[in-house]
Amino acid sequence: MSSKQQWVSSAIQSDSSGRSLSNVNRLAGDQQSINDRALSLLQRTRATKNLFPRREERRRYESSKSDLDIETDYEDQAGNLEIETENEEEAEMETEVPAPVRTHSYALDRYVRQKRREKQRKQSLKRVEKKYTPSELALYEIRKYQRSTDLLISKIPFARLVKEVTDEFTTKDQDLRWQSMAIMALQEASEAYLVGLLEHTNLLALHAKRITIMKKDMQLARRIRGQFI
């Protein structure tokens, strides 16, 4: 058994050594081919470089003009430069200084300030209208009429109404005219009658446990008061 194992191990070692030698030979051949290709490529690049030989640009350093010509050219250029500077200074003095250019941010700030001012002006001019309830309005009217003893009906419409009524009850031959004091006395009497009638009507509505005045309340008040009371 030991001799057989030794034979197997020796066979394996010989096989592995043969494989390693073959791999080394193959790698060496590949390296040689790579070196040959690199050398040929290098030679080709050198050959292409030799096709374009370098030439020194001597014309750049050689001057075709003499010293006298250079000096005259320099003097002419200096004179032209002085004339140009004088002309530029005169032109700058003649031209007006332009206004500074306003940037976009400056214009935007100005627009915002203008809109803000307009909004504040509108708010100051706009009146705040307060909404009152019907009960508040009624209380305001009661206090307003209690403070004054003036007539409640306008004078001109009342005078027009009186003339229309008199024209209906008179003929064309009769020419009735009213004095201003007579119309004022008639207006005071009619307003006193209406105010008294409405007071009694309101009392009847409250007696019926109502706030709203109705037609039947006024009819009952007229019946109680009599025809001319």
UniProtKB/Swiss-Prot annotation:
Return the annotated region ranges for H3-like: 132-229
Q: Which SMART domains match?
A: H3 (SM00428)
Q: Which InterPro entries match?
A: Histone-fold, Histone_H2A/H2B/H3, Histone_H3/CENP-A
Q: Give the location in the cell.
A: Nucleus; Chromosome, Centromere
Q: Which domain of life is it from?
A: Eukaryota
**Motif Nuclear localization signal positions after renumbering to this chain:** 115-132
Biological process, per Gene Ontology: 2-micrometer plasmid partitioning; kinetochore assembly; mitotic cell cycle; mitotic sister chromatid segregation; protein localization to CENP-A containing chromatin; rRNA transcription
Look up what happens after changing M218T: In CSE4-102; impairs nuclear division by disrupting the core centromere structure
Q: What else is known?
A: Mutation in CSE4 causes chromosome non-disjunction and cell cycle arrest at mitosis.
- Supply the name of the protein: Histone H3-like centromeric protein CSE4
Species of origin reads: Saccharomyces cerevisiae (strain ATCC 204508 / S288c) (Baker's yeast)
